[in-house]
Amino acid sequence: NMDRAPIIAIIGQGSTKRLHKESHQIMDSIRMCEPISKWSQTILAAENITEIVRKAFKIAEAEKPGLCVVELPEDIAKVQIDDTPMSPTKVRRPGADHKAVAQAHELILNAKNPIILAGNGTIRKRASNRLRVLVENLGIGGINTFMAKGSVSYKDKHSLFTIGLGSGDYNNLAIDESDLVIAIGYD
């Protein structure tokens, strides 16, 4: 999941009584999914369903978002449970470090040819409007990655459009000529 989309995959599995042996349609799905997922877990007891599913959502949505796999064996899936979903926990994000903000401000003020590189995080965190205001107020050119297309509007006079893979792209030249790259939401 290179695009950093939060995904929950709930996959089936044979009965827990057959997991330890070679059996028809039994495979180690969790081990197979580990290299491509942020977290993978088998539900081995029905009373753990709510907790495991909630944890999967929390991990999938946390920075950097990605795939979480929950494996549900057929015998556990048949069990009726008397449970209610857990309430989401509100998390307050810490504020920025004042010294780091002051240093960044100083770097921007002293840069002769700065450029903003906008990544997918600007889309995920719905920061495009604030980014556009920043680009306009600072008068700094802005480049989008493929997954951040539109975070700096192509209609804006400061837009340098979307950066690609080509080594001869004008956008790459703009970055090469820059004395400060301000990466915002870039993974």
Where are these regions (language model features)?
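N-terminal alpha/beta PP-like core and its mobile active-site loop of ThDP/TPP-dependent enzymes
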Residues: N1-D187
